[in-house]
Amino acid sequence: MAGLNVSLSFFFATFTLCEAARRASKALLPVGAYEVFAREAMRTLVELGPWAGDFGPDLLLTLLFLLFLAHGVTLDGASANPTVSLQEFLMAEESLPGTLLKLAAQGLGMQAACTLTRLCWAWELSDLHLLQSLMAQSCSSALRTSVPHGALVEAACAFCFHLTLLHLRHSPPAYSGPAVALLVTVTAYTAGPFTSAFFNPALAASVTFACSGHTLLEYVQVYWLGPLTGMVLAVLLHQGRLPHLFQRNLFYGQKNKYRAPRGKPAPASGDTQTPAKGSSVREPGRSGVEGPHSS
């Protein structure tokens, strides 16, 4: 029970400190620096840092749901996920310099989270932390299936995640936050036994890239190329194109929003109209009074 209390305390302390740092950055930094850099670094830290608490499987899914739910409410749209930043670039919602700054901020947040994790384990606040500190140099891989299957699983998880984000991007946080949190929790429960269901290159690089069992190239194929492929497919399915790269819709035909009214075309000035059947036409030069020989 003491270990559980330590883990929960560490979880909420990390989240509270990151939220305080985010608010201070928003107040002190220029708007561009905060939106592009600081909030991404803080979200990456708050997403990766709390897992140093080493939760058991009985609490992991519940805390994962609460973490993503809190993210949706407090972190101003920051993603802490490189594939989400690349999605915004492909959707023409972010410029290339802004995207590169977000990726750099996420890398910085990842390094800060790793440092925080090692520091927490070194304190040996619980028996689990002591065990993690001893096993840090010989951790086991999160990839527990073949490389092609793992890449397919990560791509499928990322596809569902990004397609949901695209459908809910204009929805109020009160609806999108719980929906995304529930999706991430269900995905982690379903795909967790195979790849741990990261579908986040920064999170995967922080947690499992240093572990033995697979080469760096195999990890890159599963945890970087897999989510990137799933994200691109989600954008293509949702938009029919990659807006930043292609203007032409590759999948869906575009219908004209404004349709011309269906009316009879106006006759040209030189056109002669055909008289209607049964109507009389007067010849030029004849008066309206009929002659004596008319019957």
Swiss-Prot record:
Q: What is its main location?
A: membrane
Q: What phylogenetic lineage does the species belong to? A: Eukaryota, Metazoa, Chordata, Craniata, Vertebrata
Q: In chain numbering, where does the motif NPA 1 fall?
A: 81-83
Q: What is known of its domains?
A: Aquaporins contain two tandem repeats each containing three membrane-spanning domains and a pore-forming loop with the signature motif Asn-Pro-Ala (NPA).
Q: Name one GO molecular function term.
A: water channel activity
Q: In UniProt terms, what function does this protein have?
A: Putative aquaporin. Could form homotetrameric transmembrane channels, with each monomer independently mediating water transport across the plasma membrane along its osmotic gradient.
- Bilayer topology: Multi-pass membrane protein
* Entry-linked InterPro entries: AQP11/12_channel, Aquaporin-like, Aquaporin_11/12, Aquaporin_12, MIP
What intervals of the chain are marked intramembrane?
A: 77-114, 195-206
Which residues are exposed on the Extracellular face of the membrane? 42-55, 143-145, 192-194, 207-223
Q: Which cysteines are joined by disulfide bonds?
A: none
Q: Where are the transmembrane segments?
A: 23-41, 56-74, 121-142, 146-166, 175-191, 224-244
Localization per record? Membrane
Q: Which UniProt keywords apply?
A: Membrane, Repeat, Transmembrane, Transmembrane helix, Transport
Catalytic activity line of the entry: H2O(in) = H2O(out)
Any Gene Ontology CC annotation: membrane
Assembly with partners or alone: Homotetramer; each monomer provides an independent water pore.
Taxonomy, superkingdom: Eukaryota
This one is known as Putative aquaporin-12B
Q: Coiled-coil intervals in this record?
A: none
Ranges for region Disordered:
257-295
Q: Which residues lie on this side of the membrane: Cytoplasmic?
A: 1-22, 75-76, 115-120, 167-174, 245-295
Q: Which SUPFAM superfamilies match?
A: Aquaporin-like (SSF81338)
- Organism from which the protein derives: Homo sapiens
Give start-end ranges for motif NPA 2.
200-202
Which family, according to the similarity comment? Belongs to the MIP/aquaporin (TC 1.A.8) family. AQP11/AQP12 subfamily.
